[in-house]
Design a protein with these regions (language model features):
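RNA substrate-binding interface of SAM-dependent RNA methyltransferases
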Residues: 3-93, 159
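Structured loop/turn residues at beta-strand edges in well-structured enzyme cores
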Residues: 9, 83, 108, 127, ...
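Short beta->alpha connector loops at strand-helix junctions that form conserved
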Residues: 16, 41-42, 116, 133-141
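Short glycine-/acidic-enriched loop or helix-start segments at secondary-structure transitions
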Residues: 24-25, 50-51, 98-101, 122-125, ...
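Short, glycine/charged-enriched secondary-structure capping and boundary segments
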Residues: 27-29, 53-56, 102-106, 126-129, ...
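Active-site/ligand-binding-proximal alpha/beta "capping" segment
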Residues: 93-128, 132-136
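Structured adenosyl-cofactor binding patch, chiefly the S-adenosyl-L-methionine
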Residues: 125-165
Length: 165
């Protein structure tokens, strides 16, 4: 039933080589709030349980434990998630498709894919996904959104769409 918190998880997040403890702490906060799974890829990604991340999360009184699944490579993550029937949406400021113009499938779980904190998703990686979207913004005032801001905006809007519409 819409509006209930214990419904099937439909929003999941994949991060390609995430390395900032502060960004990870923010992402854990969002993931706990919407009860989603987090996937990470890349040998250089830092684990979510390092002391710097754990202490920041504890300082915010976050008590839930987020489910993190790690893949050694981005390709491995995409192959596994595809084999599970997930619909993969990439994020990039260099695409023309606006997030709000998405026509989401009703029969598949959604995985939103975010690139590295510094360079985003490469074109090659974007081509591996079902589609790529961007958040609308005034580019004359802001060139980009930080990873935690983009994650929050997209994850919460998808959560609202699936649970409260």
């Amino acid at each position: 039933m819409k509006g209930e918190i214990d419904i099937m998880k439909k929003v999941e997040l994949l991060f390609d080589t995430i390395r900032s403890p502060y960004d990870i702490a923010h992402i854990i906060q969002v993931a706990n709030a919407i009860d989603c799974v987090i996937y990470t890829a890349g040998k250089n990604s830092i684990p979510f349980d390092i002391p710097k991340v754990v202490s920041k999360v504890k300082s915010w009184n976050i008590t839930g434990k987020v489910k993190e699944i790690h893949y050694d490579t981005f390709d491995e993550a995409i192959a596994d998630l595809r084999s599970k029937g997930k619909y993969l949406i990439g994020t990039s400021g260099n695409t023309n498709k606006i997030f709000y113009d998405l026509d989401l499938p009703d029969d598949k779980d959604i995985v939103v894919v975010f690139g590295t904190e510094t360079s985003g998703l490469t074109l090659t990686k974007q081509e591996m996904l079902d589609e790529t979207i961007k958040l609308p913004m005034d580019k004359s005032k802001v060139d980009f959104l930080t990873l935690p801001v983009a994650v929050s905006a997209i994850a919460y809007e998808l959560y609202r769409k699936y649970n409260f519409e």
